[in-house]
């Protein structure tokens, strides 16, 4: 959770009250590791400012390890989201260099630790340079934070996407860049939720669509199929 704070005394049922806010990742396949990243936050004496975070998880499909980064950027304004987008890109680019959450040689004291318990289920392999970054980014495609992630538009056509950057799966799969609405801004339809796929995985994008009938949220879910 990006926010996990006491909300005062116990509730009517006697249980502690808490303010909690964060991201959830569910997988049919085993989650091999996860990392929790806090994103830059701005203090505010006006609109409510909440600590935002990103949850990075690794899952192997058909022998290939994928990284998924699930996030929810601030609703405040573009100026407060840009540092968060920059941090997401830093996390992505440095992930292979930082390696697995637990890696390297294991040193234990058998008398104190009772054996080589850290070595049980020790993570192996390398961190994938490719990732899928998805969630509620609270921004439309004409904003600076979107451009940071996908690259600037060129007058010669298309976006100048860096090989270490991301493509917008909705657009890459043939979706209308001006459509795919998932929510609204001031009662105007808007696309705020995305599945960004690292450039190295772009050819794996098979389909991307918005479930317009789902009733579970004030935002509509975005589905992505990789093949």
Named regions from a protein language model:
Residues 2-227:
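Active-site regions of metal-assisted phosphoester/phosphodiester hydrolases
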